[in-house]
């Protein structure tokens, strides 16, 4: 089966595992997914991730994070720029997610970064997803 949007699949697997309160989820690896996982870890949305090499594509194992009363840390994930309709923004028009409570993940010439980092570097790019 050909996958038309691997980033949407990545976000959906995390969303589904989070809703089912799983402790971890395995996702086929790619450099973009590693960058997204690093951002989610740095922003505190996941506990950790590890890349497992299987001499093919490899897998990323993401360890989900929950609060002290087992409440979800990730409230929502939304894919913004899709293969059929790309969404690009300039540095002046970078989005704010829930007035700064969430993050927008942007693919820029400086790499895959959050909206906050993009504002600091004054760069625009493709809006990959919102996480809150």
Swiss-Prot record:
PROSITE patterns: RIBOSOMAL_S8
Record-level GO cellular component terms: ribonucleoprotein complex; ribosome
Keywords recorded for this protein, A-Z: Ribonucleoprotein, Ribosomal protein, RNA-binding, rRNA-binding
An example molecular function term from Gene Ontology annotations: rRNA binding
Tree of life domain: Bacteria
Entries under InterPro entries matching the protein: Ribosomal_uS8 (IPR000630), Ribosomal_uS8_CS (IPR047863), Ribosomal_uS8_sf (IPR035987)
Claim: Ribonucleoprotein is one of the keywords in the record: yes
Keyword RNA-binding: yes
Any one biological process term the GO annotation gives: translation
Coiled coil: none
Assembly: Part of the 30S ribosomal subunit. Contacts proteins S5 and S12.
Family, similarity comment: Belongs to the universal ribosomal protein uS8 family.
General function of this protein: One of the primary rRNA binding proteins, it binds directly to 16S rRNA central domain where it helps coordinate assembly of the platform of the 30S subunit.
PANTHER family in the cross-refs: 40S RIBOSOMAL PROTEIN S15A (PTHR11758)
UniProt protein name: Small ribosomal subunit protein uS8
Organism phylogeny: Bacteria, Bacillati, Bacillota, Bacilli, Lactobacillales
Gene: rpsH
């Amino acid at each position: 089966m050909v996958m038309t949007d691997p980033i949407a699949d990545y976000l959906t697997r995390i969303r589904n595992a989070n809703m089912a309160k799983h402790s971890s989820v395995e996702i086929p690896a790619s450099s973009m997914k590693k960058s997204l996982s690093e951002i989610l870890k740095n922003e505190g949305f996941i506990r950790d991730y590890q890349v497992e090499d299987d001499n093919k594509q490899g897998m990323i194992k993401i360890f989900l994070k929950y609060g002290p009363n087992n409440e979800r840390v990730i409230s929502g994930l939304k894919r913004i720029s899709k293969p059929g309709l790309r969404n690009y923004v300039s540095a002046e028009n970078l989005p704010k997610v829930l007035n700064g409570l969430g993050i927008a993940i942007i693919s820029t010439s400086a790499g895959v970064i959050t909206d906050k980092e993009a504002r600091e570097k004054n760069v625009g790019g493709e809006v990959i997803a919102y996480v809150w």
